[in-house]
Amino acid sequence: MSVKWEKQEGNVGKLTFDIEQEKVKEGLDRAFVKVRKTLNVPGFRKGKVPRQIFNQRFGEEALYQDALDILLPEVYSQAIDEAGIDPVDTPQVNIESMEKGETWVLTAEVTVKPEVKLGDYKGLEVEKRETELTTEELEAELKQLQERQAELVVKEDAPAENGDTVILDFEGFKDGVAFEGGQAENHSLELGSGQFIPGFEEKLVGLKAGDEADIELTFPEEYHAEDLAGQPVVFKVKLHEIKTKEVPALDDELAKDIDEEVETLDELKEKISKRLQEAKEESVAQAKQEEVIAKAVENAEVDIPHAMVHHEADHLMNHFAQDLQAQGLTPELYYQFTGQTEEAMHAQMETDAEKRVKMNLVLEAIAEAENIEPTEEAIDEEISTLAEKYGMEKDAVRAALGDMSELKSDLKIRKAIDVLLDSAVEK
């Protein structure tokens, strides 16, 4: 096989390769076997026409396209290996020469993985974050748990305050006319929750059960309903009932209500402290990793082909559709509810995709610069982890992973991240 790679502008180049006569003959033979199965020729049973008769009747050229379809995956793969290039998309292959009895010559305009010019990636400064759980953090968590056990009790002859829950009727009017979506009866609203437009909840503070009021407001300029955005309106409201939170005492009894596995408040505090400490350490480690990766990526230079970004955006769109499906929705319903289009969503995904692509390219380049190669022990350990996670036999996991290229790439990237973290300087 003759292969020629001509680098052009950016990440694109022209790949010229051929299929030698002997290989062409093999492809034609395989194509004839495929075509003959469905061929009807008078005087012969279906699928039994001899090759010579086929050539006389249709010409050998009738097999060329099928032969090319059969041979192309193999010869293209061989050509890119010999050229030493790493394509990032499937190119359009053009036929330069396809003469009977001669070598076939093909060309393809190929977009390849870009070269990464690494900047500083070792000894990067990162923020020193506190990992020790504070008393304030523990108390805040206990307070949240305490408030979750609170009960709402009716407030008798007392004005509504922030934090109270009111039961009310309301109807909104613009220029004296009720507008769509502005009416409800016996609606439950926690004051201070920010569920309504600015000013609505604040003007309910101080009212008592049985009170009626007209609340004058202006919708925010960025409100989603264009006919109401920035417009003055009046809400007629009537309060039926006010409820306040009755928070239980933080004691042993409450501790047992919160967690049936503990007997005392001290036991609950110890259990929560351990959980919060682990979560904080994990959060700090994640923040450090994200910061050091972001700095290494920022310091690197790379011209990312749009094909890579588009492919990654497609991948993100597929994940998005799967997440919606898990919630019982479809992309079509989501677009209908939100007023967004698939094209706009894909464009939004491309922004995230470009960041992800650059990050992966930089981490791969760091792995290469550090001569990182996963050991057989590391590969076997990862396979064991996957087998346990998905309840599969190790051999089944190996079979599913195929040539292990994706697994090896993941392990390389993890090791590259370790290089960044191990050399990072906390300040």
UniProtKB/Swiss-Prot annotation:
What are the protein's UniProt keywords? Cell cycle, Cell division, Chaperone, Cytoplasm, Isomerase, Rotamase
State the compartments where it is located.
Answer: Cytoplasm
InterPro entries of this UniProt entry?
PPIase_dom_sf, PPIase_FKBP_dom, Trig_fac, Trigger_fac_C, Trigger_fac_C_sf, Trigger_fac_ribosome-bd_bac, Trigger_fac_ribosome-bd_sf, Trigger_fact/SurA_dom_sf
PROSITE patterns membership: FKBP_PPIASE
According to its UniProt entry, the function of this protein is described as: Involved in protein export. Acts as a chaperone by maintaining the newly synthesized protein in an open conformation. Functions as a peptidyl-prolyl cis-trans isomerase.
Say which species the protein is native to.
Answer: Listeria welshimeri serovar 6b (strain ATCC 35897 / DSM 20650 / CCUG 15529 / CIP 8149 / NCTC 11857 / SLCC 5334 / V8)
Catalytic function, reaction form: [protein]-peptidylproline (omega=180) = [protein]-peptidylproline (omega=0)
Q: What Gene3D superfamilies does its record include?
A: 3.10.50.40, Trigger factor ribosome-binding domain, Trigger factor, C-terminal domain
Q: What is this protein called?
A: Trigger factor
> Can the keyword Signal be found in this entry's annotation?
no
Give me the Gene Ontology terms describing cellular component: cytoplasm
Q: Which GO terms describe its biological process?
A: 'de novo' cotranslational protein folding; cell division; chaperone-mediated protein folding; protein transport; protein unfolding
Q: What is known of its domains?
A: Consists of 3 domains; the N-terminus binds the ribosome, the middle domain has PPIase activity, while the C-terminus has intrinsic chaperone activity on its own.
Q: What is its main location?
A: cytoplasm
Gene of origin? tig
EC number(s) stated in the UniProt entry for this protein: 5.2.1.8
PPIase FKBP-type domain location is 163-248
